Amino acid sequence: MRQAETARKTNETNISLTLEIDGEGKADIQTDVPFMTHMLDLFTKHGHFNLTVDAKGDTDVDDHHTTEDIGIVLGQMFKEALGDKKGIKRYGSSFVPMDETLAQVVVDLSNRPHLEMRAAFPSQKVGTFDTELVHEFLWKFALEARINLHVIVHYGTNTHHMIEAIFKAMARALDEATTIDPRVKGIPSTKGML
């Protein structure tokens, strides 16, 4: 089974996380950042992962450390759960519409971390959540999972819709990229390693 779990405690956050890549979309997400809880819940559902997260942090300061550290831990567990990556499709892409918004996410599980993001959010906040933290979360996730992640919001006017479409598209792209393809023998690279 492709799964991983960890607990990470710092002076700023305390996070426990379990991930099953080949799941059923079951989520048990408990964080001090309600908007991230919502995004992780739908990420799990649309990626067909099983994910549990218990994250507490210094949200009396702001949501930055908790959001960033969830991205770090989720990325680390994604990398660990994927193991040697034998037989995976490696690449995945998805377009997701949400009302007036269209988001696109493309991933390569290449072991070369990079985030390219094109999204101009009209609002600086969704509720109490600072929208600049979306980039922070995605970058830390890509860095720790060691994936190449491209995120484009082609258009949209509602910031909540734009971010939600990103998380859904990322989930669907990762679901595709992590799928075992019976035609792929070994590592999906001419170098023989990822």
Swiss-Prot record:
Pfam families to which the protein is assigned, alphabetical: IGPD
Keyword ATP-binding: no
Coiled-coil regions listed in the entry: none
CDD domains: IGPD
Main location: cytoplasm
PROSITE patterns given in the database record: IGP_DEHYDRATASE_1 (PS00954), IGP_DEHYDRATASE_2 (PS00955)
Chemical reaction(s) catalysed: D-erythro-1-(imidazol-4-yl)glycerol 3-phosphate = 3-(imidazol-4-yl)-2-oxopropyl phosphate + H2O
GO biological process, one term: L-histidine biosynthetic process
Top EC class for this record: lyase
A GO cellular component entry from the record: cytoplasm
Disulfide-bonded cysteines: none
GO molecular function, one term: imidazoleglycerol-phosphate dehydratase activity
SUPFAM superfamilies hit by this protein: Ribosomal protein S5 domain 2-like
Enzyme Commission no: 4.2.1.19
Cell location: Cytoplasm
UniProt KW keywords: Amino-acid biosynthesis, Cytoplasm, Histidine biosynthesis, Lyase
InterPro entries (alphabetical): IGPD_sf, ImidazoleglycerolP_deHydtase, ImidazoleglycerP_deHydtase_CS, Ribosomal_Su5_D2-typ_SF
Pathway: Amino-acid biosynthesis; L-histidine biosynthesis; L-histidine from 5-phospho-alpha-D-ribose 1-diphosphate: step 6/9
Family membership: Belongs to the imidazoleglycerol-phosphate dehydratase family.
Official protein name in the record: Imidazoleglycerol-phosphate dehydratase
Gene name as annotated: hisB
